[in-house]
């Protein structure tokens, strides 16, 4: 039996015994985790999810926390900054060994769900977003939801950030330069995926700019 699972925005075809390198998970070596986003199960009977196969899961043992090969990015700052520089980056990964594929019963297995380290560190940011509790409110209340909180920084001072992008950041719970300046690589990856920035944070040099702007 094999399964096609999704984690960290990527898809992997796996079977029991496979060693897999995935984006860093919030788990320690020796722990068993369960991937619940299973797109397809194959074998004697093929089951395709819509989008995921109900009650299916892939269990794996965390072997080690590792780093991928170094990637060099050429960063060119625009608008207020004209400097250019190169930046090296090694993606943090987790090495896991697939131990079992569950066609059913995954929901009640009791095994810890595989969760990206970036998702865990961004939990507070996601919880701070007022969007879920405001859906049933009138239109005026929804507009107020997107407005900056009192004392919030002017995020439009960041390179490439206009009114629309500022609104998107605020809705994601980001209201100050101090928050952005404190982002880790995992936070950057999580915000990239959550708000579909497609590498904009590093490309525009937001973290460096935020550190300077936070000083006042």
Curated annotation (Swiss-Prot):
Annotated SUPFAM superfamilies: L21p-like
Any single biological process term in GO: translation
Top-level taxon in the UniProt lineage: Bacteria
Keyword rRNA-binding carried by entry: yes
Keywords: Ribonucleoprotein, Ribosomal protein, RNA-binding, rRNA-binding
GO molecular function: rRNA binding; structural constituent of ribosome
Cellular component GO terms, alphabetical: cytoplasm; ribonucleoprotein complex; ribosome
Pfam families on file: HHH_5, Ribosomal_L21p
Family in the record: Belongs to the bacterial ribosomal protein bL21 family.
Subunit note: Part of the 50S ribosomal subunit. Contacts protein L20.
HAMAP family on file: Ribosomal_bL21
General function of this protein: This protein binds to 23S rRNA in the presence of protein L20.
Protein name (Swiss-Prot/TrEMBL): Large ribosomal subunit protein bL21
